[in-house]
Amino acid sequence: MELRNTKLEQLFYIYHRNLKYRCPMQYLTKRGFNLQDLLSVGGGLAYLGEKQWLNLSLYNFNNQLVGFLSRKVGFEKKFLYLPINKPPSKSESFLGLKHLPTETNTIYLVEGDFDWLAFRKGGILNCLPLCGLTLSDKQMKFFQQSKIEKVVLCLDNDFAGKVAAANLERILKNAGFQVKVVQLKGKVKDWNELLLLYPKNWAKALRDHLAL
């Protein structure tokens, strides 16, 4: 894996020197991340329809790669599930599942891919993104089979996120899980925004907000 990352870093360095590949790197930097944050979870860069996309890997419950979540680089927030002709089932997979520690009995759930990267950057590795606001029955069953006992809901600080957190709290408790809801304070919308407020001491800030 280390050898693979080294080769990818060299390749991305060459890309970065080319003007047309600077935009994705600048986009990552503005969101508080660096190249290694992307590469460490099997991320990459893709071109589709002459547009640049950041790719993150989707794995099924057997840790098999089944596709990619692609985020469009730019101001417009747009996502695609790849391959387009046979998109992976969101209800039967998780973004970055392969990188979830197996020895944990607690899982942190966030809404988006960049929220997930922010948690990992802060040292909270037992985290998964919903890539939305719902959790499927198959995903909950996977948690039960994986001996997950406690779920910490860390959704966005907006109306939709608060409603979803309340719904998920009820559903998860009915399924037998211990549930904790962590709500962001003030006008901070999500965990990626919080990262941008505390770039130099992010690990401490994240743990403080999670009351760890």
Curated annotation (Swiss-Prot):
Gene3D superfamilies the UniProt entry points to: 3.40.1360.10
Toprim domain: residues covered: 105-187
GO biological process assignments: DNA replication, synthesis of primer
PROSITE patterns from the UniProt entry: TOPRIM
CDD domains found in the cross-reference section: TOPRIM_DnaG_primases
One Pfam family, short name: Toprim_2
GO cellular component, one term: cytoplasm
PANTHER family: DNA PRIMASE
Identification of the protein by name: Uncharacterized protein MG010 homolog
Natural source organism: Mycoplasma pneumoniae (strain ATCC 29342 / M129 / Subtype 1)
Organism lineage string: Bacteria, Bacillati, Mycoplasmatota, Mycoplasmoidales, Mycoplasmoidaceae
